[in-house]
């Protein structure tokens, strides 16, 4: 109070006012503060002060020729004074108004193209639906989210090259556009932006928005795809949320969603094949998502999901250093441990070999619907703070944490035997055995865990074994919190290794991911996923396997035919026949295979019995390991359409129908392709008889002159070679035998050799 009186007193004296308003500021510290650096120290004051002047804006000199000196009201628009320190002129804010009203109008055709992301956003909002506002506690957790809908997925460097090429094509500097997407975008943008008058810098900024994924670490409760994030400020506050349905989808969200589905399908399929890693790579390389190669998407897309990360690891890309267990992402935030093997007994007296983590560690656990903080020591859970969307999600998190803790009371809570297997029928490792067991039923686990009295801590509440909340008691060490646990923000990527069975390890040998961690959730992809690999034929069911197998044989008939006669074993082992085996009843597979292989051998040995249609029809059955038996079959059974259907060994059936006149094959009524050659090889027998006494060496060789007819062959001397015309106009090279004794065998090998030579 005293100070205020004193100040009032001072202000009443005229000298004080004069000192404060008229004296110059010459204190060096103050001058330094306001003049050092380019950064404006008080922008709003500067703006007000500038705009109070008559000519606060500078413009290019040419403006004086384009704007009158005075407007209709007679106000001066520009000053004859030059701007100090540049060759620009000083103009009034009124000049801007005049320009906006009367200045030249340029073409607006480029605006929607340049500001594409903005125009699209307006459309999404126009067609979006905003629902009611609910007031409730929001469990938000910080997640790394995509804040920029509608972008391509180029790296910053790739985008920079594209932007330079589009906006400043004549600038110097090495730009190498390599990826498919870079080239497509550059071509498209150059066409769109012909004669564009918008400032190049603006165009560059807008292109960057379109090409690069921008992520931020934001608190989110609810949808995390970019079309939800762009309206985050409208849909969730501290204590309220507003329902919202986006008015459109964007390709980047669709790519993320479809990539996850493709990766899950591929990992699940690879896990059950003979060589999971090789199969996984083969499938990743032969799959397209929305017309783009999956491997290109994997290289550019930062989505972190278990299956996606396994595919990335297989391709040698870096992935996040966090690990996955029970569908939760674990990130160690402090402490350390060493691994030691230990044998433990379950409640059912089954022995389990556990890799025990010894030492104190703290983790954050982040799942789709629940998050937690876990503190543990060697085989002991010290504290678990969980938050989740609903009771079910909280239960999931508690089970995973209890199993992860490796506590004895958890192992003793096992009732019955643990014999869970993965898709390939291999036993799961002990930790996943325990996890599956308690995910099925956690009652005994929670009952055996033990309870303790709790202190009243703000925002925390106890939870009892039957999942009812309580303020007095709680399961030992477990609390439920209103606040979520943030996702780990560090986006560091580490080098990892992957073994044949798709287990991903960091450089210290800790397992980060394995196929057991891949979600079984099925979804429908937003973009078309095209799996070209035979391993994915069964994804659309047995019929698709049947049709695809026969289509493959027909497409590759030329090479298949040669292998059939020269190297059948290699042909039978082809992976394209693997999916077919699941259609053949297990008990009879071996007998079918033995029968078909024997039949084929007879065809190779006996003249004139080569039958294209029959070979194509029966070939897939020969792929199973054969059992030798005397059994003969007139039809073979395949399991499709929910029952066994028959393929006739001789003749057509609804499953396999070959039309001789059109040469078309239909499998289960679906077109499986056309045979390009005539399956009627009846003439072979005659020719082989005529060629007795000659050895067929192979394809035509021009050095031995023009082709002779079969009749002209008799003039050849022993050991002499010649080209000869046979059958339907094919030419082969033959040599007259030096000895007569081997003549008998010629007719048998001739058929085979003619066939090979022609092919």
Curated annotation (Swiss-Prot):
Does the keyword field hold Iron? no
Q: Which InterPro entries match?
A: Flu_PB2_2nd, Flu_PB2_6th, Flu_PB2_C, Flu_PB2_CAP-bd, Flu_PB2_middle, Flu_PB2_N, INV_PB2, PB2_helical
Disulfide bond residue pairs: none
Q: Which GO terms describe its cellular component?
A: host cell mitochondrion; host cell nucleus; virion component
Pfam families (UniProt xref): Flu_PB2_1st (PF20947), Flu_PB2_2nd (PF20948), Flu_PB2_3rd (PF20949), Flu_PB2_4th (PF20950), Flu_PB2_5th (PF00604), Flu_PB2_6th (PF20951), Flu_PB2_7th (PF20952)
- Indicate which residues form the motif Nuclear localization signal: 736-739
Give yes or no: UniProt keyword Methyltransferase.
no
Primary localisation category? virion
Subcellular location per the Swiss-Prot or TrEMBL entry: Virion; Host nucleus; Host mitochondrion
Molecular functions (GO terms): RNA binding; RNA-directed RNA polymerase activity
GO biological process entries: 7-methylguanosine mRNA capping; cap snatching; DNA-templated transcription; symbiont-mediated suppression of host cytoplasmic pattern recognition receptor signaling pathway via inhibition of MAVS activity; symbiont-mediated suppression of host gene expression; symbiont-mediated suppression of host mRNA transcription via inhibition of RNA polymerase II activity; viral RNA genome replication
Keywords attached to this entry: Cap snatching, Eukaryotic host gene expression shutoff by virus, Eukaryotic host transcription shutoff by virus, Host gene expression shutoff by virus, Host mitochondrion, Host nucleus, Host-virus interaction, Inhibition of host innate immune response by virus, Inhibition of host MAVS by virus, Inhibition of host RLR pathway by virus, Inhibition of host RNA polymerase II by virus, mRNA capping, mRNA processing, Viral immunoevasion, Viral transcription, Virion
Residues the record annotates as the site (Mammalian adaptation) are 627
Q: Which function does this protein serve?
A: Plays an essential role in transcription initiation and cap-stealing mechanism, in which cellular capped pre-mRNAs are used to generate primers for viral transcription. Recognizes and binds the 7-methylguanosine-containing cap of the target pre-RNA which is subsequently cleaved after 10-13 nucleotides by the viral protein PA. Plays a role in the initiation of the viral genome replication and modulates the activity of the ribonucleoprotein (RNP) complex.
What family is this protein classified in? Belongs to the influenza viruses PB2 family.
Q: Give the quaternary structure.
A: Influenza RNA polymerase is composed of three subunits: PB1, PB2 and PA. Interacts (via N-terminus) with PB1 (via C-terminus). Interacts with nucleoprotein NP (via N-terminus). Interacts (via N-terminus) with host MAVS (via N-terminus); this interaction inhibits host innate immune response.
What name does UniProt use for this protein? Answer: Polymerase basic protein 2
Q: What organism does this protein naturally occur in?
A: Influenza A virus (strain A/India/6263/1980 H1N1)
Higher taxonomy: Viruses, Riboviria, Orthornavirae, Negarnaviricota, Polyploviricotina
């Amino acid at each position: 109070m005293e100070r205020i009186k004193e100040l009032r007193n001072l202000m009443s004296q005229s000298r004080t006012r004069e000192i404060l308003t008229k004296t110059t500021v010459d204190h060096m510290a103050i001058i330094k503060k306001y003049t050092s650096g380019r950064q404006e120290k008080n922008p709003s004051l500067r703006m007000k002060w500038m705009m109070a002047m008559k000519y606060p804006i500078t413009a290019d000199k040419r403006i004086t020729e384009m704007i009158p000196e005075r407007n209709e009201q007679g106000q001066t628009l520009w000053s004859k004074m030059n701007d100090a320190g540049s060759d620009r002129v000083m103009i009034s804010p009124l000049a801007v108004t005049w320009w906006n009203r009367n200045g030249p109008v340029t073409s607006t055709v480029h605006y929607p193209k340049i500001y594409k992301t903005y125009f699209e956003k307006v459309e999404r909002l126009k067609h979006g639906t905003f629902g009611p506002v609910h007031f409730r506690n929001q469990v938000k957790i910080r997640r790394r989210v995509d804040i920029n809908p509608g972008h391509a997925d180029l790296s910053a460097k790739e985008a920079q090259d594209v932007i330079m090429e589009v906006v400043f094509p004549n600038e110097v500097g090495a730009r190498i556009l390599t990826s498919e997407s870079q080239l497509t975008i550059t071509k498209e943008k150059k066409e769109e932006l012909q004669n564009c008058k918008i400032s190049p810098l603006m165009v560059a900024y807008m292109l960057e928005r379109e090409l690069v994924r921008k992520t931020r670490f934001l608190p989110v409760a609810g949808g995390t795809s970019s079309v939800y994030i762009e309206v985050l400020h409208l849909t969730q506050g501290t204590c309220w949320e507003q329902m919202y349905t986006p008015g459109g989808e964007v390709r980047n969200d669709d790519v993320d969603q479809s990539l996850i589905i493709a990766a899950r399908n591929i990992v699940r399929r690879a896990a059950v094949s003979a060589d999971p890693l090789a199969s996984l790579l083969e499938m990743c390389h032969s799959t397209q998502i929305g017309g783009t190669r999956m491997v290109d998407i994997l290289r550019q897309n930062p989505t972190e999901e278990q299956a996606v990360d396994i595919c990335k690891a297989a391709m040698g890309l870096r992935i996040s250093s966090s690990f996955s267990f029970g569908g939760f992402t674990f990130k160690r935030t402090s402490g350390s441990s060493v691994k030691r093997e230990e044998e433990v007994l379950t409640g059912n007296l089954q022995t389990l070999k556990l890799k025990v983590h010894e030492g104190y560690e703290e983790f954050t656990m982040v799942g789709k619907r629940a998050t937690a903080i876990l503190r543990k020591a060697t085989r002991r859970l010290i504290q678990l703070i969980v938050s989740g969307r609903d009771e079910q999600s909280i239960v999931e998190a508690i089970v995973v944490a209890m199993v992860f803790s490796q506590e004895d009371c958890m192992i003793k809570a096992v009732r019955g035997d643990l014999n869970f297997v993965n898709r390939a029928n291999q036993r799961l490792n002990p930790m996943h055995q325990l996890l599956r067991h308690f995910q099925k039923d956690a009652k005994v686990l929670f009952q055996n865990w033990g309870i303790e009295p709790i202190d009243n801590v703000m925002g925390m509440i106890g939870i009892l074994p039957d999942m009812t909340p309580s303020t007095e008691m709680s399961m030992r060490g477990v609390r439920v919190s209103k606040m979520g646990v943030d996702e780990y923000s560090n986006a560091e990527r580490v080098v990892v290794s992957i073994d044949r069975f798709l287990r991903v390890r960091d450089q210290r040998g800790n397992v980060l991911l394995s196929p057991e961690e891949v979600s079984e959730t099925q979804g429908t992809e937003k973009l078309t996923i095209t799996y070209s690999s035979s391993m994915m034929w069964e994804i659309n069911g047995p019929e698709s396997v049947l049709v695809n197998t026969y289509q493959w044989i027909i497409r590759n008939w030329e090479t298949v035919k040669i292998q059939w006669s020269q190297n059948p074993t290699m042909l039978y082992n082809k992976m394209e026949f693997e999916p077919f085996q699941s259609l053949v009843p297990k008990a009879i597979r071996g007998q079918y295979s033995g029968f078909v292989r024997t039949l084929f051998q007879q065809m190779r040995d006996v003249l004139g019995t080569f039958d294209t249609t029959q070979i194509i029809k029966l070939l897939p059955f020969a792929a199973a390991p054969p059992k030798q038996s005397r059994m003969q079959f007139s039809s073979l059974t395949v399991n499709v359409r929910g029952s066994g259907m028959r393929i006739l060994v001789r003749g057509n059936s609804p499953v396999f129908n070959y039309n001789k006149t059109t040469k078309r094959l239909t499998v289960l009524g679906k077109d499986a392709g056309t045979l390009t050659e005539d399956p009627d090889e009846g003439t072979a027998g005659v020719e082989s008889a005529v060629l007795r006494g000659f050895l067929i060496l192979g394809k035509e060789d021009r050095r031995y002159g023009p082709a002779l007819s079969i009749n002209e062959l008799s003039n050849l001397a022993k050991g002499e070679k010649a080209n000869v015309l046979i059958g339907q106009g094919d030419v082969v090279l033959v040599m007259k035998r030096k000895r007569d004794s081997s003549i008998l065998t010629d007719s048998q090998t001739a058929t085979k050799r003619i066939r090979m030579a022609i092919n």
